[in-house]
Amino acid sequence: MNTIKKDRLIILTAVFAILLVVYLVFLYKLQIIEGESYYKESRNQQVTTSTVVAARGNILDRYGRVIVSNKSSYDLTINESELFPSDDSVDSNATILKLVKLIREYGEDYIDELPITTEPPFEYTEISDTDKARLQAYMKTNKVDENATAVELLSSMRTRYKIDSNYSAEEARIIAGIRYAVNVRYLINTSDYVLVQDADMKLISIIRENNMLGVNVKESFIRGYNTTYAAHILGYVGLMNDAEYEKYAELGYSGDAKVGKSGVEYAFEKYLHGTNGTVQVTSAADGTIISKTYTTEPKPGNNVYLTIDIALQEATERALATTVNALRAERGYDITEDLLGDDDKKDEEATPTPTPTPSQTPDGQDDEEKIDDEITGAGAVVVDVKTGEPLAIASWPTYNTSTMLENYSKLLTAKYSPLFNRALQGTYAPGSTFKPCTAIAGLTEKTISTSTRIKCTGVYTKYAAQGYAPQCWIYASHLTHGSDNVTEALRDSCNIFFYTVGNNLGIDKLEKYARQFGLGESTGIEIYEETGNMSNRANHYEYAGTEWVVGDTLQAAIGQADSIFTPLQLAEYCAAIANNGQRHSASILKEARSYDYSEKIVQRTEEVLSTVKTEDYNWNAVHKGMELVAKHPDGSAYATFYNYGASTVACKTGTAQKGENITNDGIFICFAPVEDPEIAIAVVIERGQSGSRCAPVARSILETYFSIKSASDVTETEGSLLK
């Protein structure tokens, strides 16, 4: 028994001895024989941890058509520690020039943030407050006199960055510009310096082949647009400035994150922005990737559905441009001129034969007057009557979102400010389009009834003794309207009728009803808007420089005085008229869904902002009067709608008086169908002369809307028959 145990012990000892010998041999081979080889290999491998940029969410229209998505791209960034090592082992300045030369050879532009001209004589350029603060921080840190000239600053940079005297002034400026950008980012502790955004793949290949130290290729995304329309709605994304970084850093954004700058990209940033991931990459000395391990998976942003119908949006922009160009051509202006800072706008915006209009317009201006002023801008908005949802928001002139960033400086100085969103930020006196509000206020307060008749004598004489006797528009032709009730007064747009109603109401009650209609109030849209102003006693002095008098009340009653509203406000006001006083929020968000569309994050809920309460017969009287504007031969929109058969239309034209030497703005509102309203439209043409000149825009929009609806109804019917 003892012998067996002894044998087993010997065997186990022998096994352990053999294993120990094998291990020692392997260790000897690893450390002594091949140690140097493995050491060199490990030194030549590099492990880096980098951010994986999460894709931004898509933007879709109300029917799920993708308007904005993402395209993979590559940015060139500067790695400060590699390009500018503390031991001066790299000729940083020579590398910078080589890099810029490569970039230019491949037709790319690099981002130069030094606010000094690129060629002598060197001078400071115009910069934003943010860039000015960066420059001041740089000068303070590097002990440069804050009053130093551009030449003096560049001279100090040549010394600081050891830029050889053999380099030309232009070459030194290139080096200084890039080193300044890197240095500034260190000072403000933000992102890496992105030298080139969306770099060409050929350039990327050359950079990688040359294994250029200090230059990183970073995978990113750029926005891809499936439409050239809706620029003012969609907005754009870009790198953060200092103020934005302070705001978004608290939310966990990386310093090099791209964020929404305007439009829905900005408004719905919290839904669209994704959460970045991290990846650990092991690379060989030649740049070959050996392994890639995601330590945190990126989470793409959510997808946002808008209330906009992109097909109707396109039709609205085309209709607006077509009518504007027709009027411009009629007045002798060159419609081929590039007003937009963008040469790729559409040929379809050509000039048609203008719709004939009456020689006299009941909204305030003689069409036969000589027009000396050029149309400077226009806006149109289409909303759903029953929900308040914006279906189309158009501003002229516009631009192509996909080329906006590269054309930005050109757009900033382009004729008529194409970046300005007139539909939401332009404010205009409503003119006679305000008269339905005055009518409802008078009917509700019982200063008039639907049967009240007021005689138009051409001149309102109640305050003639005080030297104030405003006239009706028709009196310029030595005519009067005779005796009108409220329906006929709306058809005729009789100033005398509405002067009388306004005088009996007083400005305070008139203001109350206007605000209930949303005029001078926020609409609830998430994109930046102006709220305008409804004429009132409190701020009249601020607007006019005089105290409020009764004449101001009379002018307010016909849409003049201090009243200024946006096209969106006018469209929602018109929708509230069509909806018997119910005003809904103009929120442009339909819903947001997760990146894979599986989960609903948020959904639009109908919100009633205010209600104008009055009897149905009062609404009927106003609706009928607005309908007659389109269908009665005396109506100011009759020339546009007399042969329109797609639906019944209720409308009102208006003229915003601009002053003695400036052609009036044209204003137009409408809703359709009259019997069961679906959409409301507002159109404004700056210096359009009269509201009747805007009516063709609305007709074109209505034709498109009911054509789309008819096609949709046919499809649904065919689908139900197949079931």
Language-model segment annotations:
Residues 66-69, 74, 283-295, 308, ...:
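Beta-lactam-recognizing serine transpeptidase/beta-lactamase-like catalytic domain environment
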